[in-house]
Curated annotation (Swiss-Prot):
Keyword field contains GTP-binding: no
Keyword Plastid listed: yes
Protein localization: Plastid, Chloroplast
Xref: Pfam families: HGTP_anticodon (PF03129), tRNA-synt_His (PF13393)
Predominant location category: plastid
Catalytically driven reaction(s): tRNA(His) + L-histidine + ATP = L-histidyl-tRNA(His) + AMP + diphosphate + H(+)
Classification of source organism: Eukaryota, Rhodophyta, Bangiophyceae, Bangiales, Bangiaceae
InterPro entries listed in its UniProt record: aa-tRNA-synth_II (IPR006195), aa-tRNA-synth_II/BPL/LPL (IPR045864), Anticodon-bd (IPR004154), Anticodon-bd_dom_sf (IPR036621), His-tRNA-ligase (IPR015807), HisRS-like_core (IPR041715), HisRS/HisZ (IPR004516), HisRS_anticodon (IPR033656)
Identification of the protein by name: Histidine--tRNA ligase, chloroplastic
Family annotation (Gene3D superfamilies): Anticodon-binding domain, Bira Bifunctional Protein, Domain 2
Catalytic class of the enzyme: ligase
GO molecular function, one term: ATP binding
GO BP field: histidyl-tRNA aminoacylation
Length: 430
């Protein structure tokens, strides 16, 4: 019978690797808590209309990449390809603006896109997102960018590049699209196939083309910065000024447009600079029309998302995980000893000791060997002799010293045991 394997583009995150995920998650959640951002969790599947209306029907995500299906009730369902649309749907549905006019939110979880799997890119992947809903102020844009940069700096990632652009408002882009289309039409036959299709439907998306020949053609194309309204110019200038005040260097990239239609004004990407080139690990921008577009009252917002697989690839070497060890390993032999061991396990769990009980029924020599493999600080030994004398043996594996105490004494020695474990764990040789 053929083995059942994980679907292409998905990956098991095994215990040795999950430690790094947990480390990053804990680090980021603490930082965001300090900035008074609240965690929010939304379903991983939504009505497909949410993404048709929110992301845009002319985008690659909606046209090529969504996992879309009809359920048993014939509802059109999509596994979420990104997080912002679901957050906005929740914001509207749960009337969150009635509770607080400003919402600082963050989320983390799996997303799904049918893309070609490669290093750092899977069909099921994970994003952590930051959303600031309710403010038009340029300080909101700058705060979101500052938080993203702070996350990377806290993970000892410093060789970063922040690309920044303003794509203006809908009215600005409408005028710009005409000028850009007129320019690119002259080079229609020289454009890549995708760009030829976009020339009619959404020419601004051509700026994001990865085709080298198309990029050469774009060097002389009109720049969106020349078509911004005074309001958009002022907003972008304010964002740049705040970033300077925050000592965050940036590079203005006039071709940066992002891949989602809901953005306006500020758009940005954060890339890592390595010997192998650049890799985008964070992208975001302002989306002032999305709440209204999805049926809510017009509400400004700005946010970003970080690709966790990509982040892990570059941050892993900088993460110094604490030693994997346990406090007590419980070794028993015999029915009565097993019963006593289970009772001690329960008590030590309640006192928040990290423990493991051996259930192999091996001899004590093998059980103690296993305790050493698990890097236990101490091994609690309970055999026929201990049962007969009404005691347990604690063998401190670091020093090889051991002591005999009763179960009652154990229960009154929690503070002493915690201090001793801390002493051994803090030893340089441990």
């Amino acid at each position: 019978m053929a083995k059942i394997q994980a679907i292409r583009g998905t990956k098991d995150i095994l215990p040795d690797e999950i430690q790094y995920w947990q480390f990053i998650h804990n680090k980021i959640s603490k930082l965001l808590e300090c900035a008074n951002y609240q965690e929010i969790r939304t379903p991983i599947f939504e009505n497909s209309e949410l993404y048709d209306r929110g992301i845009g029907e002319d985008t690659d995500i909606v046209n090529k990449e969504m996992y879309r299906f009809h359920d048993r009730s014939n509802r059109d369902i999509t596994l979420r390809p990104e997080g912002t649309a679901g957050i906005v749907r929740s914001f509207i549905e749960n009337k969150m603006s009635y509770h607080h006019s400003l919402q600082r939110l963050w989320y983390s979880g799996p997303m799904f896109r049918y893309e070609r799997p490669q290093s750092g890119r899977q069909r099921q992947f994970h994003q952590l997102g930051i959303e600031f809903i309710g403010s038009l102020d340029a300080r909101a844009d700058s705060e979101v960018i500052h938080l993203a940069m702070s996350i990377f700096n806290n993970l000892n990632l410093h060789n970063l590049k922040l690309d920044l652009n303003s794509i203006g408002k809908v009215e600005d882009r409408s005028i710009y699209q005409v000028k850009l289309r007129d320019y690119l039409t002259k080079y229609h036959d020289d454009l890549d196939t995708d760009s030829q299709k976009r020339l009619t439907s959404n020419p601004i998306r051509i700026l994001d083309s990865k085709d080298s020949n198309t990029q050469k053609i774009l060097t002389e194309a009109p720049k969106i910065s020349d078509f911004l309204s005074l309001e958009s110019q002022q907003h972008f200038g304010d964002v740049c000024n705040y970033l300077k005040l925050l000592n965050i260097p940036y590079n203005i990239n006039n071709k940066l447009v992002r891949g989602l239609d809901y953005y306006n004004d500020t758009a940005f990407e954060i890339k890592t600079l390595t010997s192998k080139g650049q890799d985008t690990i964070c992208g975001g921008g302002r989306y002032d029309s999305l709440v209204h577009q999805l049926g809510g009252k017009a509400t400004p917002a700005v946010g970003c998302a970080i690709g966790l697989e990509r982040l892990l690839l570059i941050a892993k070497d900088n993460i110094d995980l604490p030693n994997k060890s346990i406090d007590f390993y419980i070794a028993t032999q015999g029915t009565k000893a097993n019963e006593t061991g289970m009772q001690i396990m329960r008590f030590l769990h309640q006192q928040f000791f990290k423990i493991e009980i051996d259930v192999s029924s091996s001899n004590f020599s093998k059980q103690i060997k296993q305790a050493n493999k698990k890097r236990a600080v101490a091994c609690i030994i309970i055999g026929s002799n201990e049962i007969a004398e009404g005691i347990i043996t604690i063998k401190w594996l670091f020093s090889q010293k051991q002591e005999n105490i009763t179960v009652v004494q154990l229960k009154h020695s929690v503070s002493y045991l915690k201090k001793k474990i801390l002493f051994y764990k803090s030893s340089k040789n441990y």
